[in-house]
C-alpha cells in the first residue's frame, strides 16, 4: 500500500511529523509549537500506549544524538520500553562527506536490537533515520549516484545529492524487507512496516512548478511525502494507488490508524473516527485548509458538511490533549 502523507511543515520540523504520526493529533490546533519540547506527554494517548495495552513490547531508536527534540525523555514518557541512540548503532557508515549514518547501516544495527526484544510478546519498533538529513551540498559532484533529468539551474547539484540519498534509502529499504522476509520464513513471525518521509526538503518551493496548480493545492503538494505500508505476508489492500482512493493521499495523523487497521488490530474509537474522516477529508492540514476525497482543497467555512467532520475531529483531539481529569479515556484506548 503506498501513496503520500501530508507533513505539517516543509524543510524541517521532524518532531512535528513524528508527533502527528505517533499521537494522531493534528498540529492545526497548536501550529507554532515543537511538540516534544512543549507538551506534557505524561499519560498521553498514542500508538505506543495503544499497542502496550495489547501486550506489545515497544522500542524507539534514532542513530544520532539523544538530545534532539528531547527524544531521550519524550520517548520514555510516551511509554516506550526501551530507547536507543547513536551509541547503540555500532556500524559507522556514511555516504561520501556527509556525516550521517546511512540507512543501510542503521537497518543492519536495528536488526540486532529487534532480535533482542522479548520473544514472548509482539513487538513494536519506531525508528527515526538520519541519512537524508539536510543540507544537500556536502558531497562533491562525483559522489552523486543520481543526476536529475530536469534542469534545475542553481539547484542542480543540490537536487542530485538529495536524489542520491533517496536512491540509497530505497535500496536500504529493500535490504530490510529481505531480512524481514527471511525472518518470516525462519520463525513465522509476521511483520508489517509503515515508512513515511518526515518532510520535503527546504528547497522544494524553488524547484516546484508554480504554474501547475493554485497556491492552496501547491502548498499541500509541497508538504506531500511518500509513504508505504509493507508486510512480509499478503496484505488485503496491497496495490491501492489510484488518484482518488483513500490510500493515495492522507494526513500524517491518519497513518497510524491506517497501519493498525491493515494489521488487523483492534481500533480505538478515536482511530475509528479518523478512518471515517479519511473517507471524506483525508487531509486536514496544520494550515487553514483541508482536502476532500476527490482531491479538492477547501478552507474552513466553505462546506458545512465537511466542516462538521473536521470540527468533530478537533473536538476529540481537544479532549485528548486537554485536561486529563476531564478526558473521556474510553475514546482513546482499545476496548478490553
List each model region and its residues:
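Solvent-exposed soluble domains appended to multi-pass membrane proteins
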Residues: 1-336
Amino acid at each position: 500500500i503506498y501513496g503520500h502523507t501530508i507533513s505539517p511543515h516543509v524543510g524541517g520540523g521532524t518532531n512535528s511529523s513524528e508527533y502527528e504520526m505517533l499521537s494522531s493529533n493534528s498540529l492545526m490546533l497548536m501550529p507554532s509549537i515543537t511538540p516534544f519540547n512543549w507538551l506534557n506527554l505524561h499519560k498521553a494517548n498514542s500508538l505506543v500506549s495503544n499497542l502496550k495495552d495489547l501486550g506489545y513490547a515497544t522500542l524507539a531508536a534514532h542513530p544520532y544524538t539523544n538530545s534532539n527534540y528531547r527524544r531521550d525523555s519524550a520517548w520514555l514518557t510516551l511509554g516506550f520500553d526501551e530507547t536507543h541512540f547513536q551509541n547503540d548503532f555500532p556500524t559507522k557508515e556514511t555516504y561520501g562527506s556527509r556525516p550521517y549514518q546511512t540507512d543501510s547501516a542503521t537497518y543492519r544495527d536495528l536488526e540486532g536490537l529487534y532480535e533482542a526484544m522479548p520473544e514472548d510478546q509482539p513487538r513494536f519498533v519506531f525508528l527515526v533515520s538520519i541519512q537524508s538529513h539536510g543540507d544537500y551540498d556536502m558531497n562533491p559532484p562525483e559522489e552523486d549516484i543520481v543526476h536529475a533529468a530536469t534542469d534545475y539551474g542553481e539547484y542542480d547539484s543540490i537536487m542530485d545529492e538529495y536524489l542520491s540519498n533517496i536512491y540509497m534509502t530505497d535500496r536500504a529499504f529493500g535490504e530490510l524487507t529481505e531480512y524481514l522476509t527471511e525472518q518470516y520464513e525462519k520463525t513465522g513471525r509476521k511483520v508489517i512496516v509503515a515508512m513515511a518521509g518526515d518532510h520535503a526538503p527546504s528547497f522544494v518551493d524553488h524547484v516546484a512548478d508554480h504554474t501547475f496548480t493554485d497556491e492552496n493545492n501547491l502548498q499541500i503538494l509541497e508538504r506531500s511525502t511518500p509513504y508505504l505500508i509493507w508486510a512480509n505476508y499478503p496484505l488485503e489492500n496491497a496495490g491501492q494507488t489510484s488518484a482518488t482512493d483513500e490510500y493515495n493521499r492522507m494526513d500524517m495523523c491518519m497513518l497510524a490508524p491506517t497501519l493498525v487497521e491493515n494489521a488487523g488490530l483492534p481500533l480505538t474509537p478515536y482511530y475509528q473516527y479518523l478512518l471515517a474522516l479519511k473517507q471524506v477529508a483525508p487531509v486536514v492540514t496544520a494550515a487553514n485548509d483541508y482536502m476532500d476525497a476527490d482531491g479538492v482543497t477547501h478552507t474552513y467555512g466553505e462546506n458545512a458538511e465537511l466542516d462538521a467532520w473536521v470540527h468533530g475531529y478537533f473536538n476529540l483531539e481537544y479532549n485528548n490533549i486537554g485536561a486529563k481529569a476531564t478526558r473521556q479515556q474510553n475514546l482513546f484506548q482499545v476496548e478490553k
